[in-house]
């Protein structure tokens, strides 16, 4: 049998590991979402920029 203090330490470590894993998952999700948003905004803004450039040239 483990003593109660050992169990508390184990629980704290487990909670810390869980939080760390969640942070990592959130970070990778945020990164992929950010990359996706940047790429999609580039797809949207590049044609708009081309149209504006053509209009300003005329």
UniProtKB/Swiss-Prot annotation:
Protein function: Stimulates the expression of 39k gene most probably by increasing IE1 expression.
Q: Which keywords are on file for this protein? A: Transcription, Transcription regulation
Organism domain of life: Viruses
- What organism does this protein naturally occur in? Autographa californica nuclear polyhedrosis virus (AcMNPV)
Q: Does the keyword Transcription apply?
A: yes
* Name this protein carries in UniProt: Transactivator protein ORF121
């Amino acid at each position: 049998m483990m003593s109660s203090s050992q169990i508390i330490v184990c629980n704290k470590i487990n909670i810390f590991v869980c939080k760390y894993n969640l942070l990592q998952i959130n970070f990778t999700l945020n990164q992929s979402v950010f990359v996706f948003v940047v790429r999609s905004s580039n797809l949207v803004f590049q044609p708009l920029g081309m149209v504006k450039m053509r209009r300003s040239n005329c």
